[in-house]
Protein backbone atom coordinates (compact mmCIF):
# COMPACT_ATOMS: atom_id res chain seq x y z
CA UNK A 1 0.00 0.00 0.00
CA UNK A 2 2.80 2.40 0.91
CA UNK A 3 4.52 1.56 -2.36
CA UNK A 4 1.33 2.34 -4.28
CA UNK A 5 0.95 5.66 -2.49
CA UNK A 6 4.54 6.58 -3.28
CA UNK A 7 3.99 5.62 -6.91
CA UNK A 8 0.84 7.73 -7.16
CA UNK A 9 2.59 10.61 -5.43
CA UNK A 10 5.22 10.47 -8.17
CA UNK A 11 2.83 9.90 -11.08
CA UNK A 12 0.28 12.62 -10.38
CA UNK A 13 2.67 15.58 -10.84
CA UNK A 14 4.31 13.75 -13.74
CA UNK A 15 0.99 13.32 -15.54
CA UNK A 16 0.13 16.95 -14.85
CA UNK A 17 3.42 18.03 -16.38
CA UNK A 18 2.91 15.84 -19.43
CA UNK A 19 -0.63 17.13 -19.97
CA UNK A 20 0.67 20.67 -19.86
CA UNK A 21 2.94 20.06 -22.83
CA UNK A 22 0.45 18.19 -25.02
CA UNK A 23 0.17 20.10 -28.32
CA UNK A 24 -2.77 22.49 -28.28
CA UNK A 25 -4.04 20.99 -31.52
CA UNK A 26 -4.70 17.81 -29.51
CA UNK A 27 -7.79 19.64 -28.26
CA UNK A 28 -11.02 18.69 -29.98
CA UNK A 29 -13.11 20.99 -32.12
CA UNK A 30 -16.85 21.60 -31.80
CA UNK A 31 -18.47 21.38 -35.24
CA UNK A 32 -21.65 23.18 -34.18
CA UNK A 33 -19.66 26.11 -32.88
CA UNK A 34 -17.38 25.86 -35.90
CA UNK A 35 -20.23 26.83 -38.21
CA UNK A 36 -20.46 30.11 -36.33
CA UNK A 37 -16.70 30.61 -36.65
CA UNK A 38 -17.11 30.01 -40.39
CA UNK A 39 -19.56 32.90 -40.48
CA UNK A 40 -17.29 35.16 -38.43
CA UNK A 41 -14.37 34.38 -40.73
CA UNK A 42 -16.29 35.05 -43.94
CA UNK A 43 -15.18 31.78 -45.52
CA UNK A 44 -18.24 31.29 -47.73
CA UNK A 45 -17.92 34.57 -49.62
CA UNK A 46 -14.43 33.72 -50.87
CA UNK A 47 -14.48 29.94 -51.10
CA UNK A 48 -17.80 29.59 -52.94
CA UNK A 49 -18.19 30.81 -56.52
CA UNK A 50 -21.09 33.27 -56.64
CA UNK A 51 -24.54 32.06 -57.74
CA UNK A 52 -23.80 28.54 -58.97
CA UNK A 53 -20.68 27.40 -57.12
CA UNK A 54 -20.55 24.32 -54.91
CA UNK A 55 -20.44 25.19 -51.21
CA UNK A 56 -16.84 25.93 -50.13
CA UNK A 57 -15.43 24.14 -53.20
CA UNK A 58 -13.28 27.12 -54.18
CA UNK A 59 -12.44 28.42 -57.61
CA UNK A 60 -13.47 32.03 -57.10
CA UNK A 61 -11.15 34.44 -58.90
CA UNK A 62 -9.69 37.32 -56.90
CA UNK A 63 -8.25 39.98 -59.19
CA UNK A 64 -5.44 42.06 -57.72
CA UNK A 65 -2.55 44.25 -58.86
CA UNK A 66 -0.34 41.19 -58.46
CA UNK A 67 -2.41 38.97 -60.73
CA UNK A 68 -5.38 36.65 -60.33
CA UNK A 69 -5.70 34.32 -57.38
CA UNK A 70 -8.14 31.40 -57.25
CA UNK A 71 -9.51 30.42 -53.88
CA UNK A 72 -8.93 26.80 -52.83
CA UNK A 73 -11.39 24.02 -52.24
CA UNK A 74 -11.84 23.66 -48.46
CA UNK A 75 -14.31 20.77 -48.50
CA UNK A 76 -13.16 17.38 -47.14
CA UNK A 77 -12.40 16.01 -50.62
CA UNK A 78 -9.10 14.17 -50.27
CA UNK A 79 -7.84 14.87 -53.80
CA UNK A 80 -8.79 18.48 -54.44
CA UNK A 81 -9.77 19.77 -50.99
CA UNK A 82 -8.45 19.48 -47.45
CA UNK A 83 -9.74 16.01 -46.65
CA UNK A 84 -6.27 14.69 -45.87
CA UNK A 85 -5.38 17.57 -43.52
CA UNK A 86 -5.20 16.90 -39.80
CA UNK A 87 -5.89 19.49 -37.12
CA UNK A 88 -2.23 20.47 -36.88
CA UNK A 89 -2.10 21.12 -40.64
CA UNK A 90 -5.15 23.34 -40.42
CA UNK A 91 -3.93 25.34 -37.44
CA UNK A 92 -0.55 25.81 -39.13
CA UNK A 93 -2.25 27.18 -42.24
CA UNK A 94 -4.19 29.78 -40.25
CA UNK A 95 -1.45 30.63 -37.79
CA UNK A 96 1.66 30.47 -39.99
CA UNK A 97 0.38 30.69 -43.56
CA UNK A 98 1.94 27.34 -44.43
CA UNK A 99 0.63 24.31 -46.30
CA UNK A 100 0.95 20.77 -44.90
CA UNK A 101 4.07 20.35 -47.06
CA UNK A 102 5.63 23.56 -45.74
CA UNK A 103 4.87 25.79 -48.72
CA UNK A 104 4.08 29.44 -48.07
CA UNK A 105 0.63 30.82 -48.82
CA UNK A 106 0.07 34.19 -50.44
CA UNK A 107 -1.58 36.70 -48.09
CA UNK A 108 -4.71 36.87 -50.25
CA UNK A 109 -5.51 34.05 -47.83
CA UNK A 110 -5.83 36.30 -44.77
CA UNK A 111 -3.72 34.26 -42.38
CA UNK A 112 -2.19 37.63 -41.52
CA UNK A 113 -5.42 38.21 -39.56
CA UNK A 114 -6.42 34.63 -38.80
CA UNK A 115 -3.17 34.22 -36.85
CA UNK A 116 -4.84 36.28 -34.12
CA UNK A 117 -7.64 33.75 -33.68
CA UNK A 118 -7.78 31.50 -30.67
CA UNK A 119 -6.71 27.95 -31.32
CA UNK A 120 -10.09 26.72 -30.14
CA UNK A 121 -11.82 28.79 -32.82
CA UNK A 122 -9.47 27.30 -35.41
CA UNK A 123 -10.19 23.77 -34.26
CA UNK A 124 -13.93 24.37 -34.13
CA UNK A 125 -13.80 25.66 -37.70
CA UNK A 126 -11.88 22.58 -38.82
CA UNK A 127 -14.40 20.32 -37.08
CA UNK A 128 -17.22 21.98 -38.99
CA UNK A 129 -15.42 21.81 -42.34
CA UNK A 130 -14.98 18.09 -41.78
CA UNK A 131 -18.80 17.76 -41.79
CA UNK A 132 -19.60 19.52 -45.08
CA UNK A 133 -20.10 17.49 -48.27
CA UNK A 134 -16.84 16.66 -50.01
CA UNK A 135 -16.74 18.13 -53.52
CA UNK A 136 -14.20 17.16 -56.13
CA UNK A 137 -13.29 20.46 -57.74
CA UNK A 138 -9.78 21.01 -59.11
CA UNK A 139 -9.05 24.73 -58.83
CA UNK A 140 -6.92 26.58 -61.42
CA UNK A 141 -3.42 27.65 -60.48
CA UNK A 142 -2.94 31.31 -59.62
CA UNK A 143 -2.22 33.46 -62.67
CA UNK A 144 0.62 35.69 -61.49
CA UNK A 145 3.24 37.52 -63.57
CA UNK A 146 6.93 37.36 -62.72
CA UNK A 147 8.18 37.77 -60.03
CA UNK A 148 4.97 37.39 -58.02
CA UNK A 149 4.54 33.80 -59.15
CA UNK A 150 7.64 32.73 -57.24
CA UNK A 151 5.98 31.31 -54.16
CA UNK A 152 9.29 30.93 -52.32
CA UNK A 153 9.48 34.74 -52.21
CA UNK A 154 6.74 34.60 -49.59
CA UNK A 155 9.32 33.36 -47.10
CA UNK A 156 11.09 36.72 -47.26
CA UNK A 157 7.82 38.66 -47.32
CA UNK A 158 6.62 36.92 -44.18
CA UNK A 159 9.97 37.33 -42.48
CA UNK A 160 9.78 41.09 -43.04
CA UNK A 161 6.08 41.83 -42.71
CA UNK A 162 4.09 39.01 -41.09
CA UNK A 163 3.12 39.59 -37.46
CA UNK A 164 1.70 36.38 -36.01
CA UNK A 165 1.11 37.75 -32.51
CA UNK A 166 -2.16 36.30 -31.19
CA UNK A 167 -4.91 38.57 -29.98
CA UNK A 168 -4.51 39.73 -26.38
CA UNK A 169 -7.48 41.34 -24.58
CA UNK A 170 -6.99 44.84 -23.24
CA UNK A 171 -7.65 44.71 -19.48
CA UNK A 172 -8.57 48.40 -19.53
CA UNK A 173 -11.46 47.82 -21.93
CA UNK A 174 -14.84 46.16 -21.54
CA UNK A 175 -15.63 42.60 -22.51
CA UNK A 176 -17.73 43.89 -25.42
CA UNK A 177 -14.89 46.08 -26.69
CA UNK A 178 -12.44 43.17 -26.53
CA UNK A 179 -14.86 40.86 -28.29
CA UNK A 180 -15.32 43.44 -31.05
CA UNK A 181 -11.57 43.96 -31.36
CA UNK A 182 -11.07 40.21 -31.63
CA UNK A 183 -13.64 39.78 -34.40
CA UNK A 184 -12.55 42.84 -36.40
CA UNK A 185 -8.82 42.09 -36.22
CA UNK A 186 -8.96 38.30 -36.15
CA UNK A 187 -11.57 36.14 -37.86
CA UNK A 188 -13.44 39.07 -39.40
CA UNK A 189 -10.16 40.23 -41.03
CA UNK A 190 -11.71 43.64 -41.75
CA UNK A 191 -8.34 45.34 -42.15
CA UNK A 192 -7.40 43.10 -45.08
CA UNK A 193 -9.79 45.11 -47.26
CA UNK A 194 -10.37 48.34 -45.32
CA UNK A 195 -6.70 49.23 -44.70
CA UNK A 196 -4.53 50.70 -47.49
CA UNK A 197 -1.56 48.69 -48.75
CA UNK A 198 1.82 49.64 -50.14
CA UNK A 199 3.43 48.45 -53.37
CA UNK A 200 4.48 45.18 -51.71
CA UNK A 201 0.95 44.41 -50.59
CA UNK A 202 1.65 45.21 -46.95
CA UNK A 203 -1.14 46.83 -44.94
CA UNK A 204 -0.34 50.32 -43.66
CA UNK A 205 -0.25 49.82 -39.90
CA UNK A 206 -0.28 53.59 -39.37
CA UNK A 207 -3.71 53.89 -41.03
CA UNK A 208 -5.73 50.88 -39.90
CA UNK A 209 -9.23 50.67 -41.38
CA UNK A 210 -8.84 54.09 -43.06
CA UNK A 211 -10.06 52.86 -46.44
CA UNK A 212 -8.41 51.37 -49.47
CA UNK A 213 -8.47 52.87 -52.95
CA UNK A 214 -7.74 49.51 -54.55
CA UNK A 215 -9.63 46.78 -52.79
CA UNK A 216 -10.99 43.47 -54.11
CA UNK A 217 -11.44 43.50 -57.89
CA UNK A 218 -10.11 47.06 -57.95
CA UNK A 219 -13.04 48.55 -56.05
CA UNK A 220 -12.53 51.29 -53.47
CA UNK A 221 -13.20 50.16 -49.90
CA UNK A 222 -14.45 52.76 -47.40
CA UNK A 223 -12.89 54.23 -44.30
CA UNK A 224 -14.55 52.67 -41.24
CA UNK A 225 -12.88 54.83 -38.61
CA UNK A 226 -14.65 57.91 -37.16
CA UNK A 227 -12.34 60.14 -39.23
CA UNK A 228 -13.18 62.44 -42.18
CA UNK A 229 -14.73 60.40 -44.94
CA UNK A 230 -15.36 57.58 -42.49
CA UNK A 231 -18.27 56.59 -40.29
CA UNK A 232 -17.90 59.23 -37.61
CA UNK A 233 -21.54 60.26 -37.97
CA UNK A 234 -22.78 56.67 -37.62
CA UNK A 235 -24.13 55.56 -34.27
CA UNK A 236 -23.47 52.12 -32.85
CA UNK A 237 -27.03 51.18 -33.84
CA UNK A 238 -26.33 52.35 -37.40
CA UNK A 239 -23.33 50.03 -37.59
CA UNK A 240 -25.33 47.11 -36.22
CA UNK A 241 -28.13 47.70 -38.74
CA UNK A 242 -25.68 47.91 -41.61
CA UNK A 243 -23.96 44.67 -40.67
CA UNK A 244 -27.28 42.94 -40.06
CA UNK A 245 -29.33 44.02 -43.10
CA UNK A 246 -26.93 45.95 -45.34
CA UNK A 247 -28.56 49.38 -45.22
CA UNK A 248 -26.67 52.60 -44.43
CA UNK A 249 -28.04 55.38 -42.19
CA UNK A 250 -29.08 57.32 -45.33
CA UNK A 251 -31.06 54.30 -46.58
CA UNK A 252 -28.57 53.25 -49.25
CA UNK A 253 -27.95 49.56 -49.86
CA UNK A 254 -24.63 47.82 -49.46
CA UNK A 255 -22.74 47.23 -52.70
CA UNK A 256 -19.63 45.61 -54.14
CA UNK A 257 -17.73 42.94 -52.24
CA UNK A 258 -19.39 44.02 -48.99
CA UNK A 259 -22.66 42.59 -50.28
CA UNK A 260 -21.26 39.07 -49.91
CA UNK A 261 -19.77 39.93 -46.53
CA UNK A 262 -23.16 40.99 -45.18
CA UNK A 263 -25.07 38.11 -46.76
CA UNK A 264 -22.63 35.34 -45.87
CA UNK A 265 -21.03 36.64 -42.69
CA UNK A 266 -22.16 39.59 -40.61
CA UNK A 267 -25.91 39.02 -41.01
CA UNK A 268 -25.39 35.61 -39.38
CA UNK A 269 -23.66 36.91 -36.26
CA UNK A 270 -25.38 37.26 -32.90
CA UNK A 271 -26.78 40.59 -31.77
CA UNK A 272 -24.17 40.70 -29.01
CA UNK A 273 -21.32 40.22 -31.47
CA UNK A 274 -22.67 42.91 -33.80
CA UNK A 275 -22.91 45.30 -30.85
CA UNK A 276 -19.36 44.36 -29.85
CA UNK A 277 -18.09 45.22 -33.33
CA UNK A 278 -19.89 48.55 -33.17
CA UNK A 279 -18.47 49.25 -29.71
CA UNK A 280 -14.96 48.67 -31.01
CA UNK A 281 -15.31 50.64 -34.26
CA UNK A 282 -16.84 53.70 -32.59
CA UNK A 283 -13.94 53.79 -30.12
CA UNK A 284 -11.20 53.97 -32.75
CA UNK A 285 -9.14 57.12 -33.27
CA UNK A 286 -10.35 59.07 -36.30
CA UNK A 287 -8.11 58.72 -39.36
CA UNK A 288 -8.48 60.70 -42.58
CA UNK A 289 -9.78 58.80 -45.57
CA UNK A 290 -6.93 56.95 -47.30
CA UNK A 291 -8.76 56.41 -50.59
Regions found by a protein language model. Give the residues of each.
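N-terminal secretory signal peptides that target proteins for export/translocation
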Residues: 1-7
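Bacterial N-terminal signal peptides
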Residues: 9-20
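Electrostatic cytochrome c docking/interface patches
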Residues: 21-39, 156-185, 228
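The canonical Cys-X-X-Cys-His
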Residues: 34, 40-50, 90, 125, ...
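Electron-transfer interface patches adjacent to heme c in soluble/periplasmic c-type cytochromes
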Residues: 61-92, 112-122, 208-249, 262-274
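Membrane-embedded segments
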Residues: 88, 97, 102-106, 110-113, ...
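Extended, well-folded interaction surfaces typified by the phenylalanyl-tRNA synthetase beta subunit core
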Residues: 137-152
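A cross-kingdom marker for long, charged
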Residues: 244, 256-291
Amino acid sequence: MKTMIKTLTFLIPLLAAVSAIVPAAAQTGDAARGEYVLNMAGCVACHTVAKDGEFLAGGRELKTDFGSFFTPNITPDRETGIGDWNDEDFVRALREGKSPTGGHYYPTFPYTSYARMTEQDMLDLKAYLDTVPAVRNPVPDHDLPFPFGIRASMFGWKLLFFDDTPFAPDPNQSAAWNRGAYIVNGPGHCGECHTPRNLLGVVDSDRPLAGNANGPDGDAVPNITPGPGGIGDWSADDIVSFLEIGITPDSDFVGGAMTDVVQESTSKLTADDLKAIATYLTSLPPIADAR
